Structure formats: structure tokens, C-alpha cells
């Protein structure tokens, strides 16, 4: 940890991280960005999805069609496109795989608190 009071850890980018590294295999709830290279979008998706977790994923590109295709292929509950902070009270929040099931917030999140009743009537 850095010197100084408290538990502050400065934002850190780690380049050329091997895909089998622990930092690429676990959820890191801190300001750390492991960066690895890829040759094709398919390879990038394969690398990104090769984890048991899936809370949020990020993609950065100038090509909107490419960004949307990558977002569709990512196995995560949320995707940030060209944005690091995407939380919004009106949006559903939640992950997939070992990162959770269900959603909080947004219209989808309220469903957990509602009772649905079906009434069938013969006439």
C-alpha cells in the first residue's frame, strides 16, 4: 500500500498483463486497470468472457457499430462504452455469472418487490 494515512490506493494501470494473472481472473473493487493486447474483436471477447465473474465490462472505441457489437458479445450485467462511470439510479444494476443474479434499480429492479397475480376467467 502507498505511504500515508488511510487506505487510499492511487489509480493504477498495469500494461501487458498475462491473461492468467490473478488481477485478470478476479473482481477487483479498486482503481486498477489491467491491460492486455488482442488481435481481433473475437479474441478480445474470448479473453474478456473467460472469467467466472461478470459485473461490468468496458470498451473504448471511436466506432459506434463496433462498440455495440462488442457490448452485445460481453458476458456482463453492465457495459460502459467510452465511459468509466455508468451508474445511474434509473438504470438496472447487477451482474451475471458469479457476480450476481437479478437487478437493483430501474424498472427491472422494482420487479423483485412486486407480487404478480394471474387471473384466468372462463366465459
Where are the predicted features?
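Conserved C-terminal structural/oligomerization subdomain of aldehyde/semialdehyde dehydrogenase
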Residues: 4, 8-123
Amino acid at each position: 500500500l502507498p505511504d500515508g494515512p488511510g487506505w487510499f490506493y492511487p489509480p493504477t494501470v498495469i500494461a501487458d498483463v498475462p491473461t492468467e494473472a490473478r488481477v485478470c481472473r478476479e473482481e477487483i473493487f479498486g482503481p486498477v486497470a489491467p491491460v492486455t493486447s488482442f488481435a481481433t474483436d473475437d479474441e478480445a471477447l474470448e479473453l474478456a468472457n473467460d472469467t467466472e465473474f461478470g459485473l461490468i465490462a468496458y470498451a473504448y472505441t471511436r466506432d459506434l457499430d463496433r462498440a455495440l457489437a462488442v457490448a452485445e458479445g460481453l458476458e456482463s450485467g453492465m457495459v460502459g462504452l467510452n465511459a468509466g462511470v455508468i451508474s445511474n439510479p434509473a438504470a438496472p444494476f447487477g451482474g451475471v455469472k458469479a457476480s450476481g443474479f437479478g437487478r437493483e434499480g430501474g424498472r427491472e429492479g422494482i420487479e423483485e418487490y412486486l407480487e404478480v397475480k394471474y387471473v384466468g376467467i372462463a366465459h
